Amino acid sequence: MESVFGRVRNETSERGKYGLVSVKAGKLQRKPGTNILQADHRKGVIYMQMASDELLHFYWKERARVSREVEDDYIIFPEEAEFIKIDECTTGRVYALKFKSSSQIHFYWMQEYSDEKDKETASLINQLIADPVNTTRTINSHNNSSSRGTDDSSTSQLLQLFGAASQDALQDFNWEVLSPTAEAPAILPRFPNVNESANMYRASSESNLNGPHATAGENGEDHEEATASPLDENIDYTHSRTLELLEQLQPLILNETTFVEPFSIDRESHRVITHPRVYPKIFPHSPSDLLRISGRAELSENRDFFKHLSSLMEAVAKPESESLREICNLSLEQVQSASGAELFLHALYDRLVNEGVIVISHITQEGSDGEVEEEGDVEMRESNEKDE
């Protein structure tokens, strides 16, 4: 019993330490000289607090014990902003604080183990922004009740007080988590080139994406510089010329039983072969489970897979596929060579990375079998474990 009540007191104390609502999260900042957003590797925390003047503050600080400095401090007026999930990022759980009245948008990657906690915290943040005074009173009342020893400290129960415990209450947002991100060793999200990316928003030439720079004004107020362009509903962030050409290639792929000589499937080829937006186009006659749940070693020894790969390469060699070969910088002779399949898969990988369809983070961690796994392998393994 003591451990149960001790846990409740610890959770309540943690909430008090970091304000009304808090969530472990890191920041995303622009890589100098590029239009690539990269994850700040530091452990951090987002939290919100109502000041004595009843102004709502959105904070971010490093979560180190020795760190007390607040790096991000934004004053938010009622309904002035929203905290939304960025579904275009498929290698991590990324949220953005987007201001409705300006071009400000600040990106954060979540460091909690539970994606459900992300959703609940985001809902509370949006409740605070919409109605800071009443929501603050409700949260404080709930925390006071928890501190007296009642075991009702979960955020989901707190959400029920606002009638927002279900997904229906969040229908304006898509909270689907494609690849859960755990705390360090973490899978850090990375956004490719902004001009072609499916995972980043275009910025104007005047925009500065180096991260938020807040300076204190004479009256103690914080003034933030606009750091990124607002979301534009007219822009198709998922556009990919390569996917368009693969769509045109699909009818040319016949369900034949020819066979190519097996070869070892490397990491880059495996990411192309198993990507959910790619494999239905290049392997239309292959059972989806064959690709979705197969590791590199399994595919390298699967004769049925290489039959489907042979059908793909015969389609790539057809005259109608000249445009696809051109953007992959491959000649017909290269495609028809003994190593043509490997060359084509590697060329596809490079194209899809440049267009933002495949997102890489260059973060590695050791798998259960001792083999070093890159982010893509971890993402696929976690997906498979969920399915099982």
From Swiss-Prot:
One of its GO terms (cellular component) is cytosol. Residues 368-377 have a biased composition (Acidic residues). Residues 15-132 form the Pru domain. Keywords: Cytoplasm, Nucleus. Residues 378-388 have a biased composition (Basic and acidic residues). CDD domains: PH_Rpn13. PROSITE patterns: PRU (PS51917). The keyword Cytoplasm applies. InterPro entries: Rpn13/ADRM1, Rpn13/ADRM1_Pru, Rpn13/ADRM1_Pru_sf. Residues 202-227, 368-388 are annotated as: Disordered. GO terms for biological process: proteasome-mediated ubiquitin-dependent protein catabolic process. It is found in: Cytoplasm; Nucleus. Its main location: cytoplasm. One of its GO terms (molecular function) is endopeptidase activator activity. The Pru (pleckstrin-like receptor for ubiquitin) domain mediates interactions with rpn2 and ubiquitin. Belongs to the ADRM1 family. Component of the 19S proteasome regulatory particle complex. The 2 S.pombe rpn13 homologs, rpn1301 and rpn1302 are present at a 0.2-1 ratio. Component of the 26S proteasome, a multiprotein complex involved in the ATP-dependent degradation of ubiquitinated proteins. This complex plays a key role in the maintenance of protein homeostasis by removing misfolded or damaged proteins, which could impair cellular functions, and by removing proteins whose functions are no longer required. Therefore, the proteasome participates in numerous cellular processes, including cell cycle progression, apoptosis, or DNA damage repair. Within the complex, functions as a proteasomal ubiquitin receptor. This is Proteasomal ubiquitin receptor ADRM1 homolog rpn1302.
